[in-house]
Amino acid sequence: MIRRQKNKKFELVSKFQPAGDQEQAIKKLTDGFEQGEKAQILEGATGTGKTFTMANVIAKLNKPTLVISHNKTLVGQLYGEFKEFFPKNAVDYFVSYYDYYQPEAYVPQSDTYIEKDSSINDEIDQLRHKTTSDLMSRNDVIVVASVSCIYGLGDPREYAASVVSLSEGQEISRDVLLRDLVNIQYDRNDIDFQRGRFRVRGDVVEIFPAGYSDHAFRVEFFGDEIDRIVEVDSLTGEVIGEREQVSIFPATHFVTNEQIMERALASIKDEMNIQVKKFEGEGKLLEAQRIKQRTTYDMEMMSEVGYTNGIENYSRHMEGRKAGQPPHTLLDFFPDDFLILIDESHATMPELKAMYNGDRARKQTLIDYGFRLPSALDNRPLKLEEFEKHVNQIMYVSATPGDYELNQTDHKVEQIIRPTGLLDPEIEVRPIKGQIDDLVGEVNKRIERNERVFVTTLTKKMAEDLTDYLKDLGIKVRYLHSDIKTLERLEIIRDLRLGKFDVLIGINLLREGIDVPEVSLVAILDADKEGFLRSTRPLVQTIGRAARNSNGKVIMYADSITDSMREAIDATERRRSLQMKFNKEHGITPKTIVKPIRDVISITKDSEDKENKESFADLNFDELTKKQKQNMIKTLTAQMQEAAKKLDFEEAANLRDAIMDLKKQVHEKKK
């Protein structure tokens, strides 16, 4: 049994000291948790260094920490930052390991069954194994994760109990070690040495752990005793160092044995018989035959080889759980006294809540038509209330916390002062009558100063009309609409920063990647028209777009001041006065953020993909050259992944078939 090392401390490394009001935020949050607060909110204005504050809180509390964000891009950014802050501690990355994932689905309208299809990223799989092995063996662990952390991951007790511990001088025969390795899903391969494999040369066994990317362990025997353990470079065999003791963690998170499998098969058979009787009683003979045939095949595979495609749908039986019981997840691998940080909580909490319902709807159709047993519903993400039961202490981090977070706790800590001294922008309310002419005058002032302008409208038609009007006046302007893809959007933002145009018009300017230091004016048209984009939270976020420039200003065009406007204006003015007071006391002069303008990759490819997609139906693959086919495979793969993300299973399946056909043709030509 593995024992967790509890004596390691977090060591924060940074050339910066807490600045602005980071210090007071760190102290209040740390004191709050140490005094037993279960939930706290860090409400940090844009550009105040919330991640650095999070790192300081982690270091001071010295608890294993799970940081959750709502998309892979942000998870990657946070992972990189925390790796820099904590180079001597374990910082792990945990996201879905699928490069491509099309879930099993059935479309009753067209009687189309689509099998699960996926492609696993080996590097991410290795990082997931490193995460769980770190959590089992040490306390100084920070895991940065996506919402994948609330999906099933196997029983941590079985995982821990299956760890093979080896030490110098230990009495164990070579053959017993080989059997133990096979039991935890390691494969013997004396030629192709990869993660999750071992090889044998006489009295020497080399093991490549599942959680390592380039290190392996060489175990040397003398009779039935371990004589020496060394860590080696898995590629060159060069000795890195000697080890007195090592722990080999299972090569899978779903650990099983003969007893577990026998119990699971008996339970699956019982459920199958009940479901067959139910269908027959309802006169659904096709569904009854289908579920019996499919389940019997799966059971035969599991009995013979210990695995079947879609085995995760039987996880409730494998783990001995009751119907409706939550699955084991990454959260179960943490000790009880751990800390959760929810980054961008206004977006992450709704995502955590939505996972369960989306998963259930798809599986219910498979069950209703006899493709899966009802227990497949228990292979699922956690419900929100189940996630809440895992919470020991939690910190929600956002510039605009959502209603959920605000209802969880009264303990809110503000972080208002920016280390750069930048202020929240001035806000001015002007009448709607003559708003366009007034706006043109303000735009021209900014153009003279080589600054940029954001204009937000309420309707697509108004945005288009305003764009045309400004163009007729000779103003360089672009319209950012919802049909524009991510990469193209980034190119437009880059062109704005470079000065290729001066004004960007949009309906929703709250998406990622739209922070532009060169923007000194944000104009909000029809600010008094209540609705989603004119409610308090989006208004505050929109105002924040002018907070990265020392000349930042916001003009709201409105004939009356709504409650949402008043709340947003009051909050901004309060922060601005505090920031001005701080700057005056400390002799700080606000400076516009200097941010490098980076190239946007693959922009041309994105537009080429769009053209290829439109002409895909007209193509005859036989007429393409080998090179064209290879390029087409890449293009269709990207489209397939996009279709799967949108849950357009039929389109994804059609594209997959086309890809397989192309690959077959390319392979045949090679011969």
UniProtKB/Swiss-Prot annotation:
Name of the featured protein: UvrABC system protein B
Keywords: ATP-binding, Cytoplasm, DNA damage, DNA excision, DNA repair, Excision nuclease, Nucleotide-binding, SOS response
GO biological process entries: nucleotide-excision repair; SOS response
InterPro entries listed in its UniProt record: Helicase/UvrB_N (IPR006935), Helicase_ATP-bd (IPR014001), Helicase_C-like (IPR001650), P-loop_NTPase (IPR027417), UVR_dom (IPR001943), UVR_dom_sf (IPR036876), UvrB (IPR004807), UvrB_inter (IPR041471)
Helicase C-terminal domain segment(s): 435-601
Gene: uvrB
GO cellular component entries: cytoplasm; excinuclease repair complex
Subunit structure: Forms a heterotetramer with UvrA during the search for lesions. Interacts with UvrC in an incision complex.
Domain UVR, residue spans: 630-665
UniProt domain Helicase ATP-binding: residue ranges: 31-414
